[in-house]
């Protein structure tokens, strides 16, 4: 993991999208092949998933990877602010 505050930190809205769809962490984890603990770590930003896992999360949540994850140095969806 990169140091706190690094401009290249990956941030996400996995929890926001998951809750909007009424899914539990366990349900999402089962769908994408992860444990509930792994989903918690991703949602809290303690773990950045692989490209394959990010794609599976996006598919399971019916959205795109760039709507779920972006670099903190840019704005939402990676756009510079």
Q: How would you describe each model-predicted region?
A:
Residues 34-47:
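Recognition helix of helix-turn-helix/homeodomain-like DNA-binding domains
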Residues 52-67:
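DNA major-groove recognition helix of helix-turn-helix/homeodomain DNA-binding modules
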Residues 12-31:
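Short basic helix-loop element that most often maps to the first helix and adjoining turn
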Residues 27, 38, 67:
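Residues in the helix-turn-helix
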Residues 2, 69-81:
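Short, charged recognition helix plus adjacent turn
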Residues 8, 19-20, 48:
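Short amphipathic helical patch at the helix-1/turn junction of helix-turn-helix
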């Amino acid at each position: 993991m990169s140091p706190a505050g690094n401009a290249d930190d990956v941030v996400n809205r996995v929890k926001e999208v998951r809750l909007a769809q009424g899914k539990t962490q366990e349900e999402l984890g089962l769908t994408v092949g992860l444990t509930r603990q792994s989903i918690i770590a991703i949602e809290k930003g303690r773990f950045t998933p692989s490209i394959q896992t990010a794609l599976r999360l996006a598919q399971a949540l019916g959205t795109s990877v760039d709507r779920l994850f972006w670099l903190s140095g840019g704005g939402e969806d990676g756009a510079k602010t």
